[in-house]
């Protein structure tokens, strides 16, 4: 069936701020869908509060609303834009839940809008546990024994019947929020109570435990002609009990027999038909009992998911794009496969390689939090690697995580390693180290229930390590021997550790033996047809499928796995660089290892290498492609750390030089530079050892801000107020940070106002692009503070000085591209805190706030253009106030008090735009899911809040200064950091934990109350 012509305007719901369980994969999916629908001639409207996304760039949709994803705001947009349909399947759980709310409040019926992609009934059947179980029963597909309960009384009654352990799954929540596995009756009571509270429909499913079973996922697509295809199977390395987002996963499934696979395939076809997803993709999860082969279906997501993004990258099949086209009426056999150009999308992908995904965690940001993994997702990012075998794929994925693969584990005794065999982020390293020491596969299977096949593969890698020592002197290895070792996935660095040489020495010997990788193409068809899309991976085989062109080319290094401090903002910058360089006539080559992102879409860059961001892997690509330039300044700290080593090996780094990067990042060099330029700095000293740090602290006096060189996201940064606190801090830093970092001790400017300044410089001229005023005072990491552009409270004289000094600094450093500088203003003096000669996490926000593509301009400068040629000669004057607010993941880390400090903890952000600064702040709060009440009771705890109380009372709220029994208020402002903050957070009460945040919140509530229901304006209307 050709596309529907009765639809003209389609509204796409985004997923809001990046959060655990719902990350960059929805920017990737949404961007694909937007492009596909616009190409078909539809008018596309987007609602998404997250500015750090490519999809919210004004060029992508016809109208882009950076507004809160609430039914009230979306209804306003529907009323204004009059869409014919809403596509809710590309914005994760947030979009599905929002679509259901719009249906239930009658908005869809009122404005005559239909849901496409997944209808109301399909969403209900897929998401409502009771309806799903009934549907499965009807088609004879087994589910875990379980019951939906709506109260604690019902739950206690059913638990008696089913026993322990028991699985608790709340309905309609994201990433398993509120759920868990209870091993004791006390755990059961606590998790069930929390699950009922977290479920928007107050219901949880209680299920029999299937801990230790094998877990599989199938990615399925269906069209209105009832053609159903399986995109790929995915197998979890970790057995049931670990959320699939936190498990290592492998595609295609490795341990299924053909008969078992066909059984799962048949069940998947029956499930998607029964649930009624007729136009799009679904992810279906199964558990298989390894003892008897019993199969049960765990759940299905009637939408594009995290696994869909992985499946797309693993196979080259663009699930989100095809899902969007199916939603407007196309059939699979009418859509061409972009990669082969001769086969239709109804051909199931076939792959001749293995893909491994490994999650990335951030427990170090939440000290004291138990790192056990369960049914609630805790990872903040992931990597993917491609190899010809599981061994090669796994070893490449492990080095992509940028963790210390061996280091700490080699020093551990056996008891310490055995203590890590429970499900936790470090389990695979502990298993590998125990196998290295001779532990048997059988005993590790008993301890972990990881499939024996996977354990045997790991054992073979460890056996190969021993054999490397028996292969004779490495200098005498011939090409064939090198190839055999490298095909197992061993890096030069690891081989060096085994034989006692440096990485560079191993590299030289390997190159002398002419042992270099070949590059293969991801083609969806196991090389049966010619591939037209340039999506590649390395291996050590004979035939090279990737011939370099003779065009001038630039390699752009991505940012690797998302993590706190280095998120989707850096991917945004690299994608913009690709576009700018393509416009300038260069062939662009992207290198990245993150499957969630737009940068790793096969049609973003001219060539994509899905490879680890390590010196060895990047340098191999540089030597293969011979580019005229390599850009390292846009992907955050990951590529910056490689800059010097790459330059030393002959890579042509363009843009800001490695020497400049070092001068700004190294604290002693930077301090000397600021003194030379006469820029005020907090009094500070650099210590090289713990003893020297204590000596300098005594000289400077407390409080001090302590931080190591070369960190991102405030890693290991802390305010210390006494010698004891400093000693504890130093012990922790030297244990946690690689090498012996120098420590900067700065006088802490209590109560100072911080500024973030983004600047562009071409070496001859510098222009400040935007100055952001932080809401929270100094001491809160800039990535966790709300900020506003343009500044509201600073006088023009201070701002002019900051602007002039920032531009002077950029020129003195010789920056060619972007630089971010942080300032603290106290008593009318602006003190410089730090400068980063690279893209910062504020780039997407500032680009939208001032309507100038900063990352594109930075790439043009790196390629030799000037600011004059680009057309940026002065600081842009914004036409509105823009506020950036953050999303914090405290709910996922149960034992952590939700207070802000110098170590960054936020995972994502929202943006609010208004002609009034306080209304912009109010919108940003709602966009970050901090739903500030306009009536009810506000509880204020702490000193210095009288003015806040007066403002809230003036707005009609009842203000109390002490909690009324156990009753919680509608808004909690607590600047003392009491445990009540945690309780309120868990009960869904909006919380504010800083005095400055309280002042802004009170003003925002007062202005919003005065304004009544806020209107909506698209980004295009704001900036035109």
From Swiss-Prot:
Query: Known catalysed reaction(s)?
Result: hydrogencarbonate + L-glutamine + 2 ATP + H2O = carbamoyl phosphate + L-glutamate + 2 ADP + phosphate + 2 H(+)
| Residues bound to ATP 2 | 707, 747, 749, 754, 779-782, 822, 834
Entry-linked PROSITE patterns: ATP_GRASP (PS50975), CPSASE_2 (PS00867), MGS (PS51855)
Instruction: Extract the InterPro entries matched here.
Output: ATP-grasp (IPR011761), CarbamoylP_synth_lsu (IPR006275), CarbamoylP_synth_lsu_oligo (IPR005480), CarbamoylP_synth_lsu_oligo_sf (IPR036897), CbamoylP_synth_lsu-like_ATP-bd (IPR005479), CbamoylP_synth_lsu_CPSase_dom (IPR005483), MGS-like_dom (IPR011607), PreATP-grasp_dom_sf (IPR016185)
Which GO cellular component terms are attached? Answer: cytoplasm
Which residues are recorded as binding Mn(2+) 4? 834, 836
Residue sites binding Mg(2+) 3 per the record = 822, 834
Region annotation (Allosteric domain) maps to 930-1024
Biochemical pathway: Amino-acid biosynthesis; L-arginine biosynthesis; carbamoyl phosphate from bicarbonate: step 1/1; Pyrimidine metabolism; UMP biosynthesis via de novo pathway; (S)-dihydroorotate from bicarbonate: step 1/3
Mind listing the GO biological process terms from this record? 'de novo' UMP biosynthetic process; glutamine metabolic process; L-arginine biosynthetic process
Q: Which PANTHER family does the UniProt record give?
A: CARBAMOYL-PHOSPHATE SYNTHASE [AMMONIA], MITOCHONDRIAL (PTHR11405:SF53), CARBAMOYLTRANSFERASE FAMILY MEMBER (PTHR11405)
- Subunit (UniProt): Composed of two chains; the small (or glutamine) chain promotes the hydrolysis of glutamine to ammonia, which is used by the large (or ammonia) chain to synthesize carbamoyl phosphate. Tetramer of heterodimers (alpha,beta)4.
**Function as written in the Swiss-Prot or TrEMBL entry:** Large subunit of the glutamine-dependent carbamoyl phosphate synthetase (CPSase). CPSase catalyzes the formation of carbamoyl phosphate from the ammonia moiety of glutamine, carbonate, and phosphate donated by ATP, constituting the first step of 2 biosynthetic pathways, one leading to arginine and/or urea and the other to pyrimidine nucleotides.
Quote the protein name from its UniProt record.
Carbamoyl phosphate synthase large chain
Q: Which organism is it from?
A: Deinococcus radiodurans (strain ATCC 13939 / DSM 20539 / JCM 16871 / CCUG 27074 / LMG 4051 / NBRC 15346 / NCIMB 9279 / VKM B-1422 / R1)
């Amino acid at each position: 069936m050709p596309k529907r012509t009765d639809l003209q305007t389609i509204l796409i719901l985004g997923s809001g701020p990046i959060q655990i369980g719902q990350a960059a994969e929805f920017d990737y999916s949404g961007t694909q869908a937007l492009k596909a629908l616009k190409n078909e001639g539809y008018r596309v409207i987007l609602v998404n509060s997250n500015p750090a996304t490519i999809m919210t760039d004004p060029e992508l949709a016809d109208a882009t609303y950076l507004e809160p994803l609430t039914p009230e705001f979306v209804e306003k947009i529907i009323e204004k834009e009059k869409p014919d349909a809403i596509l809710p399947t590309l914005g994760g759980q947030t979009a599905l839940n929002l679509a259901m709310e719009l249906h239930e409040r009658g908005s869809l019926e009122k404005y005559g809008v239909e849901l496409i992609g997944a209808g109301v009934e399909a969403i209900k059947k897929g998401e409502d546990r009771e309806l799903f179980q009934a549907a499965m029963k009807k088609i004879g597909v087994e589910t875990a024994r379980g019951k939906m309960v709506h109260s604690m009384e019902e739950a206690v009654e059913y638990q008696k019947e089913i026993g322990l352990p028991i699985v608790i799954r709340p309905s309609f929540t994201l990433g398993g929020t509120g759920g868990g596995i209870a091993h004791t009756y006390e755990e059961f009571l606590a998790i069930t109570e929390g699950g009922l509270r977290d479920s928007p429909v107050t219901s949880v499913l209680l299920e029999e435990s299937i801990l230790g079973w094998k877990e599989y996922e199938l990615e399925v697509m269906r069209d209105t002609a009832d053609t159903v295809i399986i995109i790929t199977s995915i197998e979890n390395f970790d057995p049931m009990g670990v959320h699939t987002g936190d498990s290592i996963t492998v595609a295609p499934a490795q341990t299924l027999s053909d008969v078992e696979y066909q059984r799962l395939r048949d069940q998947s076809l029956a499930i998607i038909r029964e649930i009624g997803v007729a136009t799009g993709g679904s992810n279906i999860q199964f558990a298989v009992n390894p003892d008897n082969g019993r199969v049960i279906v765990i759940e299905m997501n009637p939408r594009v998911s995290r696994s869909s993004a992985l499946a797309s990258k693993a196979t080259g099949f663009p699930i989100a794009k095809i899902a969007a086209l199916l939603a407007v009426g196309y059939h699979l056999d009418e859509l061409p496969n972009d990669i082969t150009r001769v086969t239709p999308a109804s051909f199931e992908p076939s792959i001749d390689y293995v893909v491994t995904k490994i999650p990335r965690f951030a427990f170090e940001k939440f000290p004291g939090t138990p790192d056990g993994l369960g049914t609630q997702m805790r990872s903040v990012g992931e990597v993917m690697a491609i190899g010809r075998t599981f061994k090669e794929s796994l070893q490449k994925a492990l080095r992509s995580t940028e963790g210390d693969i061996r280091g700490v584990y080699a020093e551990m005794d056996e008891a310490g390693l055995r203590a890590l065999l429970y499900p936790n982020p470090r389990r695979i390293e502990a298993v590998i180290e125990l196998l290295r020491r001779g532990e048997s596969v059988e005993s590790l299977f008993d301890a972990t229930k990881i499939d024996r096949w996977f354990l045997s593969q790991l054992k073979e890698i460890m056996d190969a390590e021993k054999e490397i020592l028996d292969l004779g002197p490495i200098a005498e290895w011939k090409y064939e021997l090198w190839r055999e070792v490298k095909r197992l996935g061993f890096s030069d660095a690891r081989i060096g550790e085994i034989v006692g040489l440096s990485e560079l020495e191993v590299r030289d010997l390997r190159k002398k033996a002419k042992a270099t990788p070949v590059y293969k193409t991801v083609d969806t068809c196991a090389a049966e047809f010619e591939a037209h899309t340039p999506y590649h991976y390395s291996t050590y085989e004979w035939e090279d499928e990737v011939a370099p062109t003779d065009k001038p080319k630039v390699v752009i290094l991505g940012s690797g796995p998302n993590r706190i401090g280095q998120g989707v903002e850096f991917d945004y910058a690299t994608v913009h660089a690709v576009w700018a360089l393509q416009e300038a006539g260069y062939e662009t080559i992207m290198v990245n290892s993150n499957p969630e992102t737009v940068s790793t879409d096969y049609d973003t860059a001219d060539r994509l290498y899905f490879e680890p961001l390590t010196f060895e892997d990047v340098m191999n690509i540089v030597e293969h492609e011979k580019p005229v330039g390599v850009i390292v300044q846009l992907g955050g700290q990951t590529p910056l750390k490689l800059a010097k080593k790459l330059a030393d090996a002959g890579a042509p780094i363009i843009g800001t030089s490695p020497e400049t990067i070092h001068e700004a990042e190294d604290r002693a060099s930077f301090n000397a530079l600021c003194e030379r330029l006469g820029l005020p700095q907090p009094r500070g000293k650099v210590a090289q050892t713990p003893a020297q740090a204590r000596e300098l602290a005594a000289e400077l006096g407390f409080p001090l801000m302590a931080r190591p060189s070369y960190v991102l996201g405030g890693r290991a940064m802390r305010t210390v107020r006494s010698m004891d606190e400093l000693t504890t801090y130093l012990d922790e830093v030297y244990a946690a940070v690689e090498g012996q970092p120098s420590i900067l001790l700065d006088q802490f400017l209590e109560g100072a106002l911080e500024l973030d300044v983004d600047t562009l410089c071409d070496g001859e001229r510098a222009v400040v692009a935007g100055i952001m005023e932080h809401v929270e005072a100094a001491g809160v990491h800039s990535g966790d503070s709300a900020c506003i552009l343009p500044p509201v409270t600073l006088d023009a004289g201070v701002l002019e000085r900051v602007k002039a000094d920032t531009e002077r600094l950029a020129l003195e450093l010789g920056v060619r591209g972007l630089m971010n500088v942080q300032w603290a203003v106290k008593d009318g003096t602006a003190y410089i805190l730090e400068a980063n000669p690279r893209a910062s996490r504020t780039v997407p926000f500032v680009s939208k706030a001032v309507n100038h593509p900063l990352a594109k301009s930075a790439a043009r400068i790196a390629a030799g253009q000037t600011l004059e040629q680009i057309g940026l000669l002065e600081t842009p004057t914004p036409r509105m106030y823009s506020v950036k607010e953050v999303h914090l993941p405290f709910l996922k880390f149960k034992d952590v008090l939700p207070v802000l400090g110098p170590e960054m903890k936020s995972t994502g952000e929202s943006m609010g735009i208004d002609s009034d600064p306080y209304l912009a702040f109010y919108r940003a709060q709602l966009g970050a899911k901090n739903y500030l009440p306009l009536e009810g009771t506000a509880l204020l705890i702490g000193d210095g809040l009288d003015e806040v109380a007066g403002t809230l009372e003036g707005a009609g709220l009842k203000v109390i200064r002490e909690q009324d029994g156990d009753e919680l208020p509608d808004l909690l402002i607590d600047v003392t950091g009491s445990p009540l903050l945690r309780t309120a957070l868990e009960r869904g009460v909006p919380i504010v934990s800083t005095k400055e945040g309280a002042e802004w919140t009170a003003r925002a509530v007062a202005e919003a109350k005065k304004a009544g229901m806020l209107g909506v304006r698209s980004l295009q209307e704001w900036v035109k």
